Amino acid sequence: MAFNIITPGRVYSATSLTFVSTIKAAFVKPPLASPSRRNLLRFSSSPLSFPSLRRGFHGGRIVAMGSSAPESVNKPEEEWRAILSPEQFRILRQKGTEYPGTGEYNKVFDDGIYCCAGCGTPLYKSTTKFDSGCGWPAFFDGLPGAITRTPDPDGRRIEITCAACGGHLGHVFKGEGFPTPTDERHCVNSISLKFTPENPTL
């Protein structure tokens, strides 16, 4: 195939110009897409999604909390007796109850996370705590997977325990008419909890 050289000052027909333009387009490579444009094309077919993270405060540091049950903490009762105070052991391990109105966290409504006093597992967010007037800390919901519910042998109440170590927290009551999203009251012993403020004082 022969090609004519276009020179200035010469008049060409529309057919000749069209032919030359077609040949030029066939041999000129289009510019490569920039990296940012390639990324846009790659991900534009489906929306981006990111896994949601739950965060809590545990031992002065932020920890992620998923929806699955926490890792089990198994200790012999002799070891629990050695690391807990006598009153903590009586309530957490022997399912006792503190006197109403005497608990450290009954009237505390600061922002933060309530963890198990035995093993440190995050249990409740402060945003779920409310004043029920019952004399014990009250929450309308626990963190996902953190609380185990077990009916008492008499069937009249439902015990709540730490899902990680089995420490006794208290009982949960439903249908009492409190204006909460769940209509539940987790009645928890203060001594079963350890509160970590969201913004601890330096």
UniProtKB/Swiss-Prot annotation:
GO terms for cellular component: chloroplast; chloroplast stroma; cytosol. Induction: By photooxidative stress. One of its GO terms (molecular function) is peptide-methionine (R)-S-oxide reductase activity. The active site is at C187 (nucleophile). It catalyses: L-methionyl-[protein] + [thioredoxin]-disulfide + H2O = L-methionyl-(R)-S-oxide-[protein] + [thioredoxin]-dithiol. Residues 1-63 form a transit peptide. It is an enzyme of class 1 (oxidoreductase). The keyword Transit peptide applies. Binds 1 zinc ion per subunit. It is found in: Plastid, Chloroplast. Its EC number is 1.8.4.12. It comes from the Eukaryota. Residues 77-198 form the MsrB domain. Reduced by thioredoxins f, m, x and y through a dithiol-disulfide exchange involving both redox-active Cys of the two partners. Belongs to the MsrB Met sulfoxide reductase family. This is Peptide methionine sulfoxide reductase B2, chloroplastic. It comes from Arabidopsis thaliana. The gene is MSRB2.
